[in-house]
Amino acid sequence: MATLKTTFAGVSMPNPFMLASAPPTTNCEMVARSFDAGWGGAVLKTMAYDLRMARNVNPRIAAYKVGKSIHGFTNFELGSPKPISKWLEDARWLKERFPEHAVFVSLLHTEGLVEEQWREVTRMFNDAGIDGFELNFSCSHGMAEAGGGAQVGGNEEAIKMVTNWVRSETNLPVMPKLPAMVPNIGSKARAAEEAGADAIATINTLNSIPGIDIYNFVPYPTVDGKSAFSVMSGRAIK
């Protein structure tokens, strides 16, 4: 009998179709519905050790159109505002209900590269029964001003350092997610491999600016008439 069952980085799943870390994996209920609909795995919404900076507003996503056709989306969404304790609970629930499906977590530091924070979170999820780790080294909204997110992905030594911290705390697959807007993404991937990465995820959204409605000069997306630095996804960046 034909089957789509596959193995990725040593993890078995019903098929090779896996939801990326994004709004569709914001909570365990949404992930469960995706599994019921046929998806083989999911990377949970990026989470951070410290939630001080995680406050999303609405609306934060806008469609980029050419004529009436949608070619992409811009957004200024941050990581998950839920605490690690809630994600641990959700991850356990998902693996109990869907033991055959792949569940990866996506980790992001907040303020400063604090070794023990990365190690502690890795140990907690390793013991929660998940299948693997994505290391978000590519988020433009991931505290880049404090040296995080895409700033890590642009620095080979930082990639090696953080990947090694996580690698030393787990035998599960470790998958750094690298940004496209770096001088040499190949050398960044090599740095991750040398630190023990099992796979590489590429790419994240690309830096952009919010659009402007030229008829009323309102930016989009807009909250109370204001917008912010954005990123773009979809067909427009291919």
Where are these regions (language model features)?
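N-terminal capping/small domains of soluble enzymes
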Residues: 1-103, 108-115, 120
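Alpha/beta enzyme core
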Residues: 32-37, 41, 96-97, 110-238
